[in-house]
């Protein structure tokens, strides 16, 4: 079985995850507040056995949350050290000492992870030395021997008998069978009897790993075993879930039989959970909702909609009617009716992947966030009180990812999605992106300095333009609607420009209809390189549009275009912007480049201590060019006149920044919208990097 997660587009990820080793002169982060939107991916629960209302929640991005009110509200507790993007698929609270917690983690699509231990109720964590670098998919504490922990990893099965201080492999080293261990179960009466669910059938040992036996009678061959649960009162009874369905054994694994009642489309059951007071009641969290049996597996019924992906189930041991679900996309759901109905319970929990951030032009404190990878649980969210409360505003988007947000001159909201441009009409998003007609325009060669006279250069360009018009006429692209990924929406006066996988489009009526493609994804001629347009920027009549390795320019609102010389040394363009003084800024893999002559010459901004630029945007309130980098969590604000800069370290990897009510807000990769704790002070101190620190 290959584990994957949905991610940002590859081009964006290659920038955002470039690394985080950075200059020591920069201050340690003071984490800005994550204010939502609430929800996102929730992975794993654990609760204090002495106080079940204290619940811990693991995520896919190294963070652990805690609730002290049974899951009604959440707060960030700690980020696991060592590296980012750890998937916390195992959380254990020590039954003897609830101040001690254990986390089993891995990195998606990589061989990395380990076991982390906390002795202060989850506030600080240290890695267990014997498990460094292990992809840990399962971690269980033995009920009959509290000092004993068993971990299932990519390599095999590991055991500790001193509460995680030392570990040893108890599966055959280098085994081609007992490896890729996704789930672990331990006999509640015998810590030497261990079940290991692998990506290719389950295994069992009754002598602490000295011998292992495959237990596959009754199972479909090559079944990935995701979860196993043992009846605490009758340990011979066990349920396991596999990609081929749910199975039950009454003989401690000697023979399994497949349970009926769960459709084949929902057979990827990620978790099985038994009611602590009634072992005949079992919950099955699947990729198509929550199922439940109350008669030991004979009859199953679905208690949620089929669009829910359930990762974990919490059942209150004091009151089994209180049930929580950890889900993909929709975060935490709560039921007070033993799963008969659920409501969102995400206050304080935000693991959203925010791709677009927009501050309302007219309403101070109003922020829009465009979310990706959350299907119908995502889309667009709005807050009118600076992030204290959010409302989903996604009607009509039908689960599409939102990569761009813009507000036209009359206040109309536009959303650039994974499939076209949508316009908000006050109650629903409508796809008013019909294209009125093809517009294929000539592109002249890149202009460079030459000893020729201006007149001769203009004559040569005119000849090339006429020849290009003749070739272009045969290649006009007819598009009925904007389709595919919209990478940028830029408002310039009454015009809106959309950079898309099909090319560049323009609207002159606030997004009701569009003209284009002005430049197609395969525009013929002297502009080398076909493909998507990723960035658009401009000032006045001048517009720039960028591909990964090319820039074009129009000085007449897009009527005609010419190619601009590409910065020497830049291998991939990610973003571009224009300052009020007309200077062109380009950000990419090798850093920031600027031009004051429309791309005739370029200067690399080599004093800036970062490369891999993810965003560039002029900020009117700061009167500076604000940029972010995939190298680290720093935000820079550069004065275009003298190239001095100040910086902030919000503690999050961000890729879009806005100023609102005297504070900065930013879109983070997996933690929603983050906001400065309070307004920045006017006084600034010089840092060793040649810029000014805005850190407090």
Task: Label each PLM-derived region with a short phrase.
Residues 4, 8, 13, 17, ...:
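Extracellular glycan-interacting surfaces
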């Amino acid at each position: 079985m290959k584990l994957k997660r949905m991610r940002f587009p590859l081009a964006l990820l290659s920038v955002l995850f470039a690394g985080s080793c950075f200059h020591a002169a920069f201050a340690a982060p003071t984490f800005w507040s994550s204010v939502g939107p609430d929800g996102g991916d929730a992975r794993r629960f654990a609760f204090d056995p002495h106080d079940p209302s204290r619940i811990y929640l693991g995520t896919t991005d190294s963070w652990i949350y805690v609730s002290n009110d049974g899951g009604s509200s959440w707060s960030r507790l700690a980020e696991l050290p060592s590296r980012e993007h750890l998937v916390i698929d195992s959380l254990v609270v020590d039954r003897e000492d609830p101040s001690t917690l254990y986390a089993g983690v891995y990195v998606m699509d990589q061989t990395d992870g380990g076991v982390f231990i906390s002795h202060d109720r989850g506030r600080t964590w240290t890695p267990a030395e014997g498990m460094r670098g292990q992809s840990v998919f399962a971690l269980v504490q033995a009920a009959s021997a509290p000092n004993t922990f068993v971990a299932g990893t990519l390599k095999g099965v590991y055991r500790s008998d001193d509460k995680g201080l030392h570990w040893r492999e108890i599966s055959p080293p280098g085994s081609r069978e007992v490896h890729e261990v996704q789930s672990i179960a331990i006999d509640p009466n015998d810590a030497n009897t261990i079940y290991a669910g692998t990506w290719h059938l389950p295994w069992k040992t009754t002598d602490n790993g000295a011998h292992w036996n495959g237990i596959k009678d009754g199972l479909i061959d090559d079944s990935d075993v995701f979860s196993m649960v043992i009846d605490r009162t009758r340990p011979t009874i066990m349920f396991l879930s596999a990609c081929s369905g749910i199975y039950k054994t009454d003989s401690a694994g000697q023979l399994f039989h497949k349970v009926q009642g769960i459709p084949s489309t929902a057979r990827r059951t990620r978790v099985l959970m038994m009611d602590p007071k009634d072992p005949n009641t079992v919950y099955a969290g699947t990729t198509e909702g929550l199922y439940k049996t109350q008669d030991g597996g004979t009859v199953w019924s679905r208690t949620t909609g089929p669009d829910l992906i359930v990762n974990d189930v919490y059942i209150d041991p004091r009151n089994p009617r209180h049930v929580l679900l950890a889900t993909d996309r929709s975060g935490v759901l709560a039921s007070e009716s033993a799963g008969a109905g659920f409501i969102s319970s995400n206050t304080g929990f935000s693991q959203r992947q925010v791709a677009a951030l927009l501050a309302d032009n007219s309403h101070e404190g109003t922020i829009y966030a465009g979310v990706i990878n959350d299907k119908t649980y995502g889309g667009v969210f709005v807050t009118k009180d600076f992030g204290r409360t959010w409302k989903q505003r996604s009607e009509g988007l039908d689960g599409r990812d939102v990569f761009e947000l813009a507000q036209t001159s009359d206040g109309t909201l536009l959303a650039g999605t994974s499939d076209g441009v949508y316009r908000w009409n006050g109650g629903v998003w409508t796809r008013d992106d019909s294209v009125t007609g093809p517009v294929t325009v000539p592109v002249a060669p890149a202009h460079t300095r030459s000893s020729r006279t201006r007149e001769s250069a203009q004559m040569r360009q005119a000849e090339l333009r006429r020849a290009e018009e003749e070739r272009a006429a045969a290649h006009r692209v007819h598009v009925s609607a904007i389709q595919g990924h919209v990478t940028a929406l830029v408002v310039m006066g009454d015009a809106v420009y959309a950079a898309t996988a099909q090319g560049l489009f323009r609207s002159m009526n606030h997004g009701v209809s569009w003209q284009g493609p002005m430049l197609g994804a395969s525009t013929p001629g002297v502009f080398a390189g076909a493909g998507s347009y990723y960035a658009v920027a401009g000032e006045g009549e001048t517009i720039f549009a960028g591909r990964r390795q090319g820039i074009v320019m129009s000085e007449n609102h897009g009527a005609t275009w010419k190619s601009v010389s590409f910065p020497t040394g830049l291998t991939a363009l990610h973003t571009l912007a224009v300052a009020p003084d007309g200077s062109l800024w380009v950000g990419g893999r090798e850093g920031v480049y600027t031009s004051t002559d429309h791309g005739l010459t370029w200067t690399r901004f080599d004093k800036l201590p970062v490369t891999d630029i993810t965003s560039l945007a002029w900020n009117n309130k700061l009167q500076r060019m604000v940029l972010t980098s995939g190298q680290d969590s720093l935000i820079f604000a550069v004065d275009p006149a003298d190239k001095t800069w100040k910086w902030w370290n919000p503690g999050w990897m961000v890729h879009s920044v806005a100023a609102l009510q005297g504070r900065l807000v930013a879109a983070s990769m997996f933690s929603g919208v983050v906001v400065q704790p309070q307004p920045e002070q006017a006084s600034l101190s010089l840092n060793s990097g040649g810029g000014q620190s805005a850190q407090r």
